[in-house]
């Protein structure tokens, strides 16, 4: 969440910046609202729904969905809608590329590569 100087509260800082350009789609409420009111706001409901990859038609069949996430703000900026619909969207392509590489490293089971991966993952 991000609080603007005027007391309005948004789902994220990018949503706050978008509001400064006149679009308040990500506004949860204001500092005058209770936490419960903010969490039950239409914006909170919409963002939570749009963030659930298991419910998105383009994502629910994707092999990477358990390891992935979507950002409704990015989707809204690129597609004009909160719901992710394009598997060619840059964040999706990048995530698939990274995950494909990580799974390839795991599959090869090269000890040197696995040690680098373990250090990177901090395990």
Model regions and ranges:
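C-terminal accessory region of radical SAM enzymes
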Residues: 15-63
């Amino acid at each position: 969440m991000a609080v603007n100087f005027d007391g309005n509260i948004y789902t994220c800082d990018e949503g706050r910046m978008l509001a400064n350009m006149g679009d308040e789609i990500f506004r949860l409420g204001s500092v005058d609202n209770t936490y419960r009111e903010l969490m039950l706001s239409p914006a909170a409901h919409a963002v939570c729904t749009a963030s659930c990859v298991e419910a998105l038609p383009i994502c629910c069949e994707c092999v990477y969905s358990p390891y992935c996430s979507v950002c409704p703000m990015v989707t809204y900026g690129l597609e004009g809608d909160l719901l992710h619909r394009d598997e060619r969207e840059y964040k999706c392509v990048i995530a698939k590329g990274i995950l494909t590489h990580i799974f390839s490293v795991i599959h090869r089971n090269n000890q040197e590569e696995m040690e680098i991966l373990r250090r990177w993952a901090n395990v």
